[in-house]
Amino acid sequence: MEEMKVTKFPEGFLWGSASAAYQIEGGWREDGKGITNWDQFVRIPGKTYKATTGDVAVDHYHRYKEDIALMAEMGLKTYRFSVSWARIYPEGRGEVNPKGIEFYENIIDECLKYGIEPMVTIYHWDLPQALVDLYGGWESEEIIEDYVNYAKTLFKAYGSKVKYWITFNEQNIFTSLGWLTAQHPPGKFDDQKTFYQVNHHVFMAHAKAVLAYREMGGTGKIGASFAYTPSYALDCKPENVMSKHDYDELKNFWWMDVYAYGRYPKAAMNYLRKKGFAPVVTKDDQKILKAAAAEIDFMGVNYYQSCVCEYNPMDGVTPYGTMNTTGVKGSAQVLGVPGIYKNPGNPYLMTTDWDWSIDPVGLRYCCREITSRYDLPIIISENGLGAFDKKTEDHKIHDEYRIDYLREHLKELGKAIEEGCEVLAYCTWSFTDLLSWLNGYQKRYGFVYVDREEEEGATLDRYKKDSFYWYQDVIKQDGENPVSYTHLTLP
């Protein structure tokens, strides 16, 4: 395709930013909220950076009006946030907590007051611990009906005000880190059989929630958000090209095909059957998945990096090794699946301090792949740069590196739209700084700096970074040729 300038984004394009309940709210035991799996997991020694918790987080629970006013000042068109299941149902089921319903209604109303479209994520990893204690959480198919009941409660409470619903955030990530690497709850290691069955339970919960939304007369848009890591073959050696294909089958299409087609990729399922890892899928399940696939309105994409695929011999690297959770650049190990693929670094790309490749073209690749394979509209539900931001003595945060990162990604997203991809929204991760699940508060993503570190007791005051003013300008210009940092006018 020929080189092009970035023209204005489509009329009605939703310029947004995102967050997650556990990472920002705090108020972990206030107003009747139940305990979540994360409230318990972070209290296990060694599980989080410097034993950080979300007990207070960045105190959005008490400061949401201040935060949403800043969003309005920036000019956001949409705010993507998640609901904490345990705030609505403290025990995961049973009695609804009216204070929980009221809190999220207040957030929705505050957004609408400023003309900001609320985009609601139903599940962003924080599960009522009561359901884990009762039947094992996602390991039991019993959770499907509890999740659907919870989702229906949200549809009933907020359906007249919310037009965009995301059933699950990054199903591929919370299940992988929970049942394969033990880095997320329930902290299980290499439990592949359970991992795939858990994923099937999540798929069924997603599908039944989508169908319930339609049965209840929901006319908004609904789908799931997937952490998409596009892959490149190391070279044109056939073994490496096949490793890329196998990677996509097992790491990308295994999820997206179910959302969009209602079926699992055949080659991946055959492989899992041979290994004894394939989930139990009934004919009724297949019908429900297929019916829901016909009802989703978009594919949500959380994009941070791409990867390289190379054939991995049987005695090669495994999926389990050191992941960089400290920000010490170069500490991550090459991982892979013996006999299939490994993911070496890309010599053509820079990396973040957490060893994530920086690849703006990869975002365009994602959009093109989804458009060609699924012919679905796209919501970029997360994209952003985690970095060590520093506040100067006069309370300025000069994050030109974040501006450069987002600017280059938006240029490629604009090209994807010019090439025929239907993109509805772009949500950065994140609006304010927040708790990074494994990296504490040192890994900052926001346009708004929050005065806190790993230790409690800071002011939690908010300060606008340089990137705040840059994104404000992008929104005013509807994304047309976003300016570089050197051309940015700062107050």
Listing of model-derived features with the role each one plays in the protein:
Residues 18-20, 82-86:
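Acidic/polar N-terminal loop/beta-strand segments that form early-domain functional surfaces
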Residues 485-491:
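Conserved small/polar residues in nucleotide/adenosyl-binding loops
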Residues 85-96:
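Glycine-rich, proline-tolerant flexible connector loops at the mouths of alpha/beta enzymes
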Residues 35-69:
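Aromatic- and Gly/Pro-rich amphipathic surface segment
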Residues 63-83:
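Catalytic domains of carbohydrate-active enzymes, especially glycoside hydrolases
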Residues 2-48, 91-93, 101-484:
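Active-site region of glycoside hydrolase catalytic domains
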